[in-house]
From Swiss-Prot, chain A:
<dbReference type="InterPro" id="IPR006654">
    <property type="entry name" value="Trp_synth_beta"/>
</dbReference>
<comment type="pathway">
    <text>Amino-acid biosynthesis; L-tryptophan biosynthesis; L-tryptophan from chorismate: step 5/5.</text>
</comment>
<dbReference type="InterPro" id="IPR006653">
    <property type="entry name" value="Trp_synth_b_CS"/>
</dbReference>
<keyword id="KW-0028">Amino-acid biosynthesis</keyword>
<dbReference type="InterPro" id="IPR001926">
    <property type="entry name" value="TrpB-like_PALP"/>
</dbReference>
<dbReference type="Pfam" id="PF00291">
    <property type="entry name" value="PALP"/>
</dbReference>
<feature type="modified residue" description="N6-(pyridoxal phosphate)lysine">
    <location>
        <position position="95"/>
    </location>
</feature>
<dbReference type="GO" id="GO:0000162">
    <property type="term" value="P:L-tryptophan biosynthetic process"/>
</dbReference>
<dbReference type="GO" id="GO:0004834">
    <property type="term" value="F:tryptophan synthase activity"/>
</dbReference>
UniProtKB/Swiss-Prot annotation, chain B:
<dbReference type="GO" id="GO:0004834">
    <property type="term" value="F:tryptophan synthase activity"/>
</dbReference>
<feature type="active site" description="Proton acceptor">
    <location>
        <position position="46"/>
    </location>
</feature>
<dbReference type="InterPro" id="IPR013785">
    <property type="entry name" value="Aldolase_TIM"/>
</dbReference>
<dbReference type="GO" id="GO:0005829">
    <property type="term" value="C:cytosol"/>
</dbReference>
<dbReference type="Pfam" id="PF00290">
    <property type="entry name" value="Trp_syntA"/>
</dbReference>
<dbReference type="GO" id="GO:0000162">
    <property type="term" value="P:L-tryptophan biosynthetic process"/>
</dbReference>
<dbReference type="InterPro" id="IPR011060">
    <property type="entry name" value="RibuloseP-bd_barrel"/>
</dbReference>
<dbReference type="InterPro" id="IPR018204">
    <property type="entry name" value="Trp_synthase_alpha_AS"/>
</dbReference>
<keyword id="KW-0456">Lyase</keyword>
Length: 430, 276
């Protein structure tokens, strides 16, 4: 199914029609240098890089994360439901897998400065943590709107001594933050590495971020064999840019490669269904005149185009302007998606779907109430998609992160949208 | 191959390549600005087709793109504007790849290139399309006799530079400094080195990124450039006019004067008139 099923394959950075390297010439030498470093250190484990990464993601990150049976959810859906607990990774989300990997790689490459974009602040905090631990100077670009609505994450980044630069252009969200980080990289390209936060951007980022994140599905396969005695029938993950998605799917697809994996954990497993769940927002579709989509469903409803270094599926107007997207979950709120995901949807290997804001909010409350796990709003989309699953084998939901960061949004949105499953908070209002 | 309009624009001494954003703040104003820039001595108009994610641009041009998009600029309106330009200088379309990709059949750049050729565009500069990904656009440009100009950056390695020199047509765009577009006071120290590395080619070399004064233009042509590319300095002038609510004719006069200063500066950098 995939074009890159052989672990040792050197890809040219394309996935079918998608991917590529659509960046200004000033960045191309850095992109080529990074491609070379990716192939040597990550794919070939030169200087024991991957061993070093695996050791640090255990001792600093807290891997492996558990695979937890969810009894009440299982009863509700009539199948065994398991949760892959990336919410228990250091920092409270899967983001550290990639951030630690890339900051470590930058060190091996001899870079002495890190820049990164962040939307909701999860990738920014993970990068700031990794930089603090590895003693790398770190600058984060974050849209002004996101700075205002994600203050605790701004403070976390500052606590780790990262500089946080608010981006005021445009709507002041993730898309603008990526643009501005690319501009910084284009200015300081010789000594700076750009830690991109998802499986997006020019090659080698989509492949490299997938490989670091695929430690999720590598563990998940070993844990399934041990705890279930078999592979799951399906894996469900939310998809914004798609890093937790490719992390949860990568080993099953067979495209991911990370030396030192237990035998058999990266072989293609075509019988495992893979469901990528996007933010349906308040409704589907693109409003061409307003340049706005009330959703972030690029994988399930978007059209092909070129954004942020890659050819992929996008939310755009008829003429090709990229629109502002929307989701109640800031981490899914992006008009593009990783090129490999776009390809795997076209080949039929991955089934894309979407879940609207209200269904995600209801699922947030169900998981909190019934299983004692407060999921990120991103994850809540994947939990809600269990309603769309009609198989009868065991299912794993990737809990991409914990929901503490979302409490204000959830309480506000649950009241505004009249979510039945929400607990009564009125008594606590002044 | 016959020399293109674009290459020929460099034949009579140092050329001034002037960039503005189409539709900033209105298509009618842009048409007036273009006439003024040509009056002031502009040899090539580089006309920006605004895209929502301009990653190669500094703040000045980002804001201009926003003004143009807010005022309703579209690829079709852009082509109408180009078709209405009277001035007898070649027009280069500067835009990002997604707009070329989406036009017409939404399946690649061929449809836009065809429409652009019809409207009178002479060539393209596409900052997010490195030579590595340029196959489909090169093919479309070749089919319609248009030029595709590549950007050589200060970071460009020797092998990449030679690949681009093999494939660039019209002229080669020498990015004078790392980073993004935006007016600067000084010529970057990287510029003479970049020009020295291109000495062996006959293709006209024009330096852009940060050029804003006649004195800078002089330094650049004195370092061996065949032309200067100026954008943000004009766009700043347009932005000031918008902020102060000046009529387009007043802004056009300022643009004409600035172009004349830049053109004179560029000419001063070359000891005697140069005829190739």
């Amino acid at each position: 199914m995939s074009t890159n099923t052989d672990d040792t394959t050197r890809t040219d950075g394309t996935f079918g029609d998608y991917g590529g390297q659509y960046v200004p010439e000033v960045l191309m030498p850095a992109v080529e240098e990074l491609t070379d470093a990716y192939e040597r250190y990550v794919l070939d484990n030169e200087d024991g890089f991957v061993d070093d990464f695996r050791q640090r993601i255990r001792s600093f990150g807290g891997r492996p994360t558990p695979l937890t049976h969810a009894p009440t959810l299982s009863q509700r859906h009539g199948v065994d439901v398991y949760l892959k607990r990336e919410d228990l990774l250091h920092g409270g989300a899967h983001k550290l897998n990639n951030a630690l990997g890339q900051v470590l790689l930058a060190k091996y490459m001899g870079k002495d400065r890190i820049v990164a974009e962040t939307g909701a602040g999860q990738h920014g905090t993970a990068t700031a943590m990794a930089c603090a631990a590895l003693e790398m100077p770190c600058e984060i670009y974050m849209g002004r709107t996101d700075v205002n609505r994600q203050r605790p994450n701004v403070f976390r980044m500052r606590l780790h001594d990262a500089d946080v630069n608010p981006v005021t252009v445009g709507s002041g969200t993730l898309k603008e933050a990526i643009n501005e980080t690319m501009r910084d990289w284009a200015t300081n390209v010789a000594d700076t590495h750009y830690v991109i936060g998802s499986v997006v951007g020019p090659h080698p980022f989509p492949s490299m971020v997938r490989d670091f994140q695929a430690i999720i599905s590598e563990e998940l396969r070993a844990q399934s064999r041990e705890q279930l005695g078999e592979l799951p029938a399906a894996v469900i993950a939310c998809a914004g840019g798609g890093s937790n998605t490719m992390g949860a799917f990568g080993a099953f697809v067979g495209s991911a490669s990370l030396p030192g994996a237990p035998a058999g954990t990266h072989e293609p497993a075509p019988d495992v269904d893979l469901l990528a769940v996007e933010a349906g927002g308040s409704r589907l579709g693109v409003d061409d005149d307003a340049g706005y989509a009330p959703n972030s469903a690029s994988l399930s409803t978007g059209t092909e185009g070129v954004l942020h270094g890659a050819r992929t599926k996008l939310l755009q107007t008829e003429t090709g302007q990229i629109v502002e997207s929307h989701s109640v979950s800031a981490g899914l709120d992006y008009a593009g998606v990783g090129p490999e995901l776009a390809h795997l949807v076209d080949t039929g290997r991955i089934t894309p779907t979407n879940v609207d804001d209200d269904a995600a909010l209801a699922a947030f409350h169900r998981l909190s109430r019934d299983e004692g796990v407060i999921p990120a709003l991103e994850t809540s989309h994947a939990v809600a998609a269990l309603d769309q699953y009609d198989g009868d084998g065991p299912v794993v939901v990737n809990v991409s992160g914990r929901g503490d960061k979302d409490l204000d949004t959830v309480i506000e949105a649950s009241a505004a949208n009249d979510i039945d499953a929400a607990p009564d908070m009125e008594v606590f209002e002044q | 191959m016959t020399r293109s309009d674009l290459a020929a624009a460099f034949d009579d001494g140092p050329a001034l390549v002037s960039y503005v954003v189409a539709g900033d703040p209105t298509p009618a104003a842009t048409a007036e600005y273009i006439d003024a820039l040509v009056d002031g001595g502009t040899d090539v108009i580089e006309l920006g087709l605004p895209f929502s994610e301009p990653v190669a641009e500094g703040t000045t041009i980002q804001n201009a793109i926003k003004r143009a998009l807010d005022a309703g600029m579209t690829p079709d309106a852009y082509l109408d504007l180009v078709a209405r330009i009277d001035a007898d200088v070649p027009v280069v379309c500067m835009t990002y790849y997604n707009l070329l990709f989406q036009y017409g059949d939404r399946a690649g750049p061929a449809a836009f290139v065809s429409a652009a050729a019809e409207a009178g565009v002479s060539g393209f500069v596409v900052p997010d399309l490195p030579v590595d990904e340029s196959g489909p656009l090169r093919e479309a440009c070749r089919a319609h006799g248009l030029d595709l100009v590549f950007v050589v950056a200060p970071t460009t390695t020797a092998d990449r530079r030679e690949r681009m020199l093999d494939l660039t047509t019209g002229f080669v765009y020498v990015q004078g400094r790392v980073g993004t577009t935006g007016a600067r006071e000084e010529v970057s120290a990287a510029t003479p080195d970049a020009l020295a590395a291109l000495q062996h080619t006959d293709i006209p070399k024009a330096v852009g990124f940060g050029v804003s004064s006649g004195e800078q233009a002089r330094e650049i042509t004195a370092s061996g450039a065949d032309g200067v590319i100026v954008g943000s300095a004009y766009v700043d002038t347009v932005a000031d006019g918008v902020a102060d609510d000046d009529p387009p004719s007043v802004v056009a006069d300022r643009l004409r004067d600035l172009a004349a200063e830049l053109k004179a500066g560029a000419a001063r950098g070359v000891p005697e008139p140069e005829h190739k």
